Swiss-Prot record:
Disulfide bonds: none annotated. It comes from Caldicellulosiruptor saccharolyticus (strain ATCC 43494 / DSM 8903 / Tp8T 6331). Residues 80-83 are annotated as: Involved in Mg(2+) ion dislocation from EF-Tu. One of its GO terms (molecular function) is translation elongation factor activity. It is found in: Cytoplasm. Signal peptide: none annotated. It holds the Pfam family EF_TS. The keyword Ribonucleoprotein does not apply. Belongs to the EF-Ts family. Keywords: Cytoplasm, Elongation factor, Protein biosynthesis. This is Elongation factor Ts.
Length: 204
């Protein structure tokens, strides 16, 4: 039996509609965590449909961390000015700016990584595997696994979210698209760290 309290709790936790929550709980036989997974899966389907829509509105969010030690600017686009002013969207932008400050990604997505960077990383990983004495026939498989770890480190969308490491940023983005009901795009970002690239003079 699905109670009104269960539907309310699921709605509060996911932001999904009441009927969607009730249906997910029924399909999950009252299992709250399974219902959340079902809603996320269904959200993915909704998000995929919205991903083709033009997102030209949005916000440029800034974040300063550690008494001016690290600064971030990130542009996040949505479809309408109405959503750009929405508190949920603005909080998402803040979360993404904080993620960039903390996790220091180099690219938004793996598609942005130049092919020569990937090839160079593969060559390094191959040499590492051979130096470890791994058999030649398993080296390629090892490289693929380690390359995924590389993507997780350098690509914002592939990184575990600092507020919930069980969720990647791309999952969080998909969740927000489903919840807000518009296509959302993390367009670009810049991260600055005080003194980065400046060689300090040696003290006498």
């Amino acid at each position: 039996m699905i109670s009104a309290e269960m539907v309310k709790e699921l709605r509060e936790r996911t932001g999904a509609g009441m009927m969607d929550c009730k249906k997910a709980l029924e399909d999950a036989n009252g299992d709250m965590e399974k219902a959340i997974e079902l809603l996320r899966e269904r959200g993915l389907a909704k998000a995929a449909k919205r991903a083709s829509r033009v997102a030209a509105e949005g916000i440029v969010e800034s974040y300063i961390h550690g008494n001016g030690r690290i600064g971030v600017l990130v542009e996040i686009n949505c479809e309408t000015d109405f959503v750009a002013r929405n508190e949920e969207f603005r909080q998402f932008a803040k979360d993404i700016a904080m993620q960039i400050a903390a996790a220091n990604p180099k690219y938004v997505s793996r598609e942005e990584i130049p092919q020569e960077v990937i090839e160079r990383e593969k060559a390094i990983l191959r040499q590492q595997a051979l130096n470890e004495g791994k058999p030649e026939n398993v080296v390629d498989r090892i490289i693929e696994g380690r390359l995924e770890k590389f993507f997780e480190e350098v690509c914002l969308l592939e990184q575990p979210w600092i507020k919930n490491p069980d969720m990647k940023i791309k999952d969080l983005l998909t969740e927000k698209i489903a919840k807000i009901g518009e296509n959302i795009v993390i367009r670009r970002f810049a991260r600055f760290e005080r003194g980065e690239g400046i060689e300090k003079a040696a003290s006498c």
